[in-house]
Amino acid sequence: MYKEGLKGLMIEKMKEIKRVFAEYFAILDNQPNIIKDYADYIEHHTAMTNNNKNLELQKIEIENMQGLLKRLEGSIKPEYNGDLEYIKNQYSKLQVELAKASEIIKAKKPEMMTNIDREMDTVKKYIKQYESNLMKDKFVEETCAPADVLKELNELKRNIDKQRDKNDYFTKIRKLMDLTTPPNKDLADLEMKYNDRKLLWTHVDKLLKCHEDWYKTNIRMLDSEDIQKEMQQFDSTVMQLKLRINNLSQDGKDKVLEVHEARIRKIAGLMPIISSLA
């Protein structure tokens, strides 16, 4: 019973380690020519190298199991000996192939660095374009419908996120290549500018909707305390945006913010009347 269990376990272990060797060689045979494949190649090579000692221990374990089985049975099937020799040869071959892969990674590095730099330059180009777009047209026109502006802002956000994903992806690959990449300050600045522009138009939209609801409601049915709280939030946001005005404008002024603030002041001026009648 013990011998059969040992034999079954040994067969399973031999089958598994042969599967791993086949998988590894298939990967190492495909030399990378594009950035993504190069990154995958490095990751696979690293994983294989880290697992190399474990494979050696598995090889030794199988060898020991065969030795024990031979002592228990007096002999062992020739096919098992053949499997063990095959595993030993495959392990030796793997050491050679891993060394070759290291050389391939080194040889391909300059080419891939050039390709990545080209991709990062494209990211920079889009960042400048999106920043320019954010500072013009309906994004800074106080007469535009907030719903239309917010729709376009959401589309712009999707495009910015694509560049963020690309930036992070190529930064990750550079790290795999043992290269450091400084934080993308221009992208971070663009994201802050976008967030403040989105915040402004979100509050413009909210204030207009609140004002419309208040206007349609019988004044005696209005809750002056709730309105006061809403107005305080609007006012607080305006103060925050004025402190970060450079995210909205290059000259320290933003017409959308100015009109929004004026609208808040006008409604705030009506609060004593609302409070007395509500």
PLM features: what roles do these ranges have?
Residues 1-278:
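Extended alpha-helical scaffold segments
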